[in-house]
Amino acid sequence: MRLYQLSPQSLQFPDPNHALDNPNGLLAVGGDLSVARLKVAYRQGIFPWFSPGEPILWWSPNPRAVLLPGELHLSRSMKKFLKRHTFHATLNQAFDDVIHACAQEHHDGTWITPDIISAYRQLHQVGKAHSVEVWHNGALVGGLYGIEQGRLFCGESMFSRMDNASKYALLAFQQHFIRHGGHLIDCQVLNSHTASLGVSEIPRVRFLQQLSQWQDIAVEEGCWLPQQLAEPAF
């Protein structure tokens, strides 16, 4: 396998199955973060991920971390918390605030650079990127953002300023997404936090099959309208 250099004159990506094994999933370098290129990338299960000072790097890891419908795991302490919490969640009410908060959450080595923020703001403006906000006494205390691909949602990052706020965001969003016909949440790479929530890994080839099957089927009308999300059931 080799690392591919993207042409600035073409939006074409190599086959994601040609990504490197080490580092896992690295596929290509270069190109830009235009809306057009990002749309092409996500249709093929490819996403940008790079640190400040690095060129744009494009990834498609194997295996792929995903959250299947109904598999979000709630610990005993989380269930206890849900019985007495004072949070409420909204959708697409404060995208800019959420992505900036996610960047601050990972400030020691954030990949959410100013260029990434600008690119995903543009994706939000054209209806491809969406945010979930969690509020406590009028203050933004948690949330997440990602990209819709039909009945798949590609989660990008989350943040939490209070205990359980990001978990609450994911729970409220997952149930909303499923009610509107959502099928799968892509979490990209498994880590200890997402694993504790019930995220699992599937082979890249299976993920790409799921992506192909569901990305051109729209969720039900009203899914992405700015709104308050229903209280999660558990």
Curated annotation (Swiss-Prot):
It comes from the Bacteria. Transmembrane segments: none annotated. One of its GO terms (cellular component) is cytoplasm. SUPFAM superfamilies: Acyl-CoA N-acyltransferases (Nat). This is Leucyl/phenylalanyl-tRNA--protein transferase. One of its GO terms (molecular function) is leucyl-tRNA--protein transferase activity. Functions in the N-end rule pathway of protein degradation where it conjugates Leu, Phe and, less efficiently, Met from aminoacyl-tRNAs to the N-termini of proteins containing an N-terminal arginine or lysine. The gene is aat. Gene3D superfamilies: Leucyl/phenylalanyl-tRNA-protein transferase, C-terminal domain (3.40.630.70), Leucyl/phenylalanyl-tRNA-protein transferase, N-terminal domain (3.30.70.3550). Keywords: Acyltransferase, Cytoplasm, Transferase. InterPro entries: Acyl_CoA_acyltransferase, Leu/Phe-tRNA_Trfase, Leu/Phe-tRNA_Trfase_C, Leu/Phe-tRNA_Trfase_N. Belongs to the L/F-transferase family. It catalyses: N-terminal L-lysyl-[protein] + L-leucyl-tRNA(Leu) = N-terminal L-leucyl-L-lysyl-[protein] + tRNA(Leu) + H(+); N-terminal L-arginyl-[protein] + L-leucyl-tRNA(Leu) = N-terminal L-leucyl-L-arginyl-[protein] + tRNA(Leu) + H(+); L-phenylalanyl-tRNA(Phe) + an N-terminal L-alpha-aminoacyl-[protein] = an N-terminal L-phenylalanyl-L-alpha-aminoacyl-[protein] + tRNA(Phe).
